């Protein structure tokens, strides 16, 4: 404690690293007993054991608050119909956005991933106004919609909440032209709940970090 006097002294503070999480797989770093854990998510584990995250009821409430703020910052309201085209499961993206959007009051369509023609049909038939997916899948959906003869003026899409992969400005422009919506970026990681860690607001001048 005596060493921490200036900002440069942060080097003396130990960090939790990926290796710590893997070495304590699956539950070794949980800070609460299992009777307090109400949900478990995990990363894909492509480079080793997956990162396992346990959530208490309070964690889920805080997480949905962060996601709701992220969505509100880009203009989502309780009048919106939000279609989630992330895969549901251990991946945090789908359920993270799902409960945040519900807390905001939006109507959520939990379509999950795949079956793109059906996805596009639901965009049209259900009057979806907010699309949640990876940017590359949004681009593909817009191409399928075009092939199906569905034009932008037949859809009600207005906002895209895209994440889980990088998105260049060129791809963003293509998505916006392809679907006629306002494209936004957000970021999350399993170690910090999931989506809701940071995201753009309607000004799109960088990601706002949720300090809480």
Question: Residue locations for each model-derived region?
Answer:
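Gly/Ser/Thr-rich beta-alpha loop segments that engage phosphate groups in nucleotides
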Residues: 47-50, 89, 190
